């Protein structure tokens, strides 16, 4: 997790630069856009921070801030998704490992070797 900033010992910030239409919609709704909430809640989960200030801005318009606190329901959903992802990756890895047993390895050619930019 890489927050846009840490605030004191307990807070963090996430800053989004928005197009005017999106920024206006955020201000009028007075809530963090759904597409950003997973990022914020995941950040709170892994960092242990107590809050995150979500900042939305668009040049020439007022900056908007909303303080977000940890949400146990989000934490459960994030942990469940991560656990499921780990199981899927482990299954794919095992399937691949079994499928390639005894197959000959091929040479990998690096066509960019020697190119200097």
Describe the role of every protein-language-model region.
Residues 1-117:
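Accessory terminal regions of nucleic-acid processing enzymes
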């Amino acid at each position: 997790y890489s927050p846009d900033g840490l605030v004191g010992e307990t807070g963090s910030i996430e800053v989004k630069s928005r197009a005017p239409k999106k920024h206006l919609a955020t201000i009028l709704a007075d809530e963090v856009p759904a597409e950003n909430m997973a990022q914020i809640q995941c950040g709170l989960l892994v960092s242990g921070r107590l809050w995150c200030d979500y900042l939305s801005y668009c040049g020439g318009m007022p900056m908007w801030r909303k303080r977000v606190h940890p949400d146990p329901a989000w934490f459960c959903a994030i942990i469940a998704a991560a656990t499921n992802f780990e199981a899927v990756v482990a299954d794919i890895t095992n399937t691949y490992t079994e499928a390639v047993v005894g197959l000959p390895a091929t040479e990998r050619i690096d066509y960019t070797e020697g190119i200097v930019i």
